[in-house]
C-alpha cells in the first residue's frame, strides 16, 4: 500500500526538508501560528480520522470519498500555512517517522499511518 515507496529517497528527503523549512518560515511569520484555533483544528482532524478509521479496510486511498477527506485534511493544514506538494508529503512522512505521531494516528486504526501515507501522497501528486 505504500505509494511513496515508489518515490526516490532523495525526493522523500526533499519532502521532509520542505516541511521543516516551510513550517519554520510560517512559525516565524505568524508568531507561532497564533492565528490558529488549535482546539478546532484538532477537533476537525479528529472527525476526519474517525471517518477514515470507521471503514479503513474497505476504503481505497484513491477513491473519491477518501480523497475528499484528504482534501479536507489539507484544508485544515492550510489554516497554519499553505504547504507545498513536497511539504504535504513531508507531513505524512513525519506521521510515520515520529514515534508519538505514529502512535497518535495509529490509535484511530492500526494501519492509519500506512493508509494516510498512500492517500496523502496521491492527493499531493494529483491535486497540488
Go through the PLM ranges and name each one.
Residues 1-128:
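Amphipathic alpha-helical "stalk" segments
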Amino acid at each position: 500500500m505504500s505509494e511513496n515507496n515508489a518515490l526516490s529517497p532523495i525526493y522523500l528527503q526533499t519532502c521532509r526538508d520542505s516541511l521543516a523549512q516551510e513550517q519554520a518560515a510560517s512559525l516565524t511569520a505568524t508568531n507561532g501560528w497564533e492565528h490558529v484555533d488549535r482546539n478546532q483544528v484538532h477537533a476537525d482532524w479528529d472527525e476526519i480520522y474517525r471517518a477514515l478509521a470507521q471503514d479503513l479496510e474497505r476504503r481505497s486511498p484513491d477513491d473519491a470519498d477518501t480523497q475528499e477527506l484528504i482534501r479536507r485534511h489539507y484544508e485544515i493544514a492550510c489554516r497554519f500555512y499553505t504547504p507545498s506538494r513536497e511539504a504535504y508529503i513531508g507531513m505524512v512522512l513525519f506521521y510515520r517517522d515520529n514515534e508519538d505521531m505514529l502512535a497518535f494516528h495509529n490509535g484511530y486504526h492500526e494501519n492509519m499511518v500506512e493508509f494516510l501515507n498512500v492517500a496523502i501522497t496521491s492527493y499531493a501528486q494529483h491535486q497540488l
